[in-house]
Amino acid sequence: MKNLNNLFLFALISLLTVSLNAQSVDEIIENYFENTGGAENWENVQGMKMNASINQMGMEIPIEMVQLKDKMYTKISVQGMDIKQGVFDGETLWSTNFMSMKAEKSDQEDVQIVKDELAEFPDPFLNYKENGFTAELMGTEVVDGSDTFKVKLTKKPMVVDGEEVPNVSTYYFDTENFVPIMMHEEVMSGPGKGMIMEAKMSDYQEVEGLYMPFSMSQGVKDQPGQPLTITSIELNVEADESEFKFPETETEVQENN
């Protein structure tokens, strides 16, 4: 009987632990949205434009990023030239080749990955359960001197090089303010396959009632990241459709005429 009671007690504790873990994850996410303006206000965000800059060898390089629910582009201004990266018009994904300075289209696997990422806009934790994602509290961890909740977000698998691979991001939420200050993702293809990419976020400021990070850095885990300073953020902007269009070559223009 004693062993039976112990077994029952162990099972009860296990159930409570699972329940508390799930509740804690939900509480962290709820507090995150509450502290950054409210989930309802986040749901009203249909588009976002960010102006930022990075420093390369002492030279400040302006960057303009526009993201909508189905389109996006990044424009980098270098020595009077605008170079576009990660441009998506809803169907075609393209970027400017830095060597040839010509626009090149991406394959359909990359197109689908971008479509899935845009479906998460403006935040992957917003309605994450309805999107089929799961969130799990992995414990606590100290990040740059701050205590954080380590939350693993598992999204729908993505297809890379013809194979279905896991799609997992790990977020580190500050335990005091409940905002993410770091995020990790594993590189699933290319020369950096297997590496852990690290993004850090800080200097949260108010933008039309919502709080967003104005200082970021991105790079490989355990290596110095590239700092990104955001100078302005606009919400629900009306973007020029021509900014997303894949540029036609002179030959294509002549053929169309």
Each language-model region and where it sits:
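Short, solvent-exposed loop/turn elements at beta->coil junctions and helix N-caps
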Residues: S53, M138-V142, E186, Y204
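N-terminal mature ectodomain segment of secretory-pathway/periplasmic proteins
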Residues: E27-M101, G139
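Flexible, processing/modification-adjacent segments and terminal tails
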Residues: Q23-E30, E34, T92-E163, G190-G192, ...
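Short capping micro-motif at the N-terminus of alpha-helices
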Residues: I63, Q85, E104-K105, K150, ...
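Gly/Pro-enriched, hydrophobic low-complexity segments
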Residues: D147-F244
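Bacterial Sec-dependent N-terminal signal peptides
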Residues: M1-V25
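Short, surface-exposed beta-strand-loop junctions and turns on beta-sheet-rich folds
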Residues: G80-D82, M101-A103, V187-S189, V220
